[in-house]
């Protein structure tokens, strides 16, 4: 067997199927498992997806939120077992794949228009 097919077989078993469709500009709730000593708890991180990167098992996404007036960004692996679930709360309409310009904006200027969805 070739190296590539072995790698594909191993990674395809690790891929998650419960991931909703989301893209840059969408507001998501990420339920991440946090280990503190011997305890494990779920921490909610809600914010705007500012980028998606990679494909397959290496895919990641970065979520940005404002906490106490300070911008906080967190990058999650898309297929990580440490992420319990992802919920999309708003679908944003943007014309860029990477929303790094949001870092320089604050308040109402950082708002994202909502995308219309067909039912």
UniProtKB/Swiss-Prot annotation:
Gene3D superfamilies: 2.30.30.790. GO terms for molecular function: structural constituent of ribosome. Keywords: Ribonucleoprotein, Ribosomal protein. PROSITE patterns: RIBOSOMAL_L19. SUPFAM superfamilies: Translation proteins SH3-like domain. InterPro entries: Ribosomal_bL19, Ribosomal_bL19_CS, Ribosomal_bL19_sf, Translation_prot_SH3-like_sf. One of its GO terms (biological process) is translation. Pfam families: Ribosomal_L19. HAMAP family: Ribosomal_bL19. This protein is located at the 30S-50S ribosomal subunit interface and may play a role in the structure and function of the aminoacyl-tRNA binding site. Belongs to the bacterial ribosomal protein bL19 family. NCBIfam families: rplS_bact. This is Large ribosomal subunit protein bL19. The gene is rplS.
């Amino acid at each position: 067997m070739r190296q590539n097919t072995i790698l594909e077989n191993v990674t395809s078993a690790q891929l998650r199927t419960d991931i909703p469709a989301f893209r840059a500009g969408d507001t998501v709730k990420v339920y991440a498992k946090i280990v503190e000593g011997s305890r494990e708890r779920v921490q909610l991180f809600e914010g705007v997806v500012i980028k998606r990167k990679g494909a397959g098992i290496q895919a990641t996404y970065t979520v940005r939120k404002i906490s106490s007036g300070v911008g906080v960004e967190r990058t999650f692996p898309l297929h990580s077992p440490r992420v319990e679930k992802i919920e999309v709360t708003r679908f944003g309409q943007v014309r860029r794949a990477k929303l790094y310009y949001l870092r320089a904006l604050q308040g109402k200027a950082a708002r994202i228009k909502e995308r219309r969805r067909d039912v």
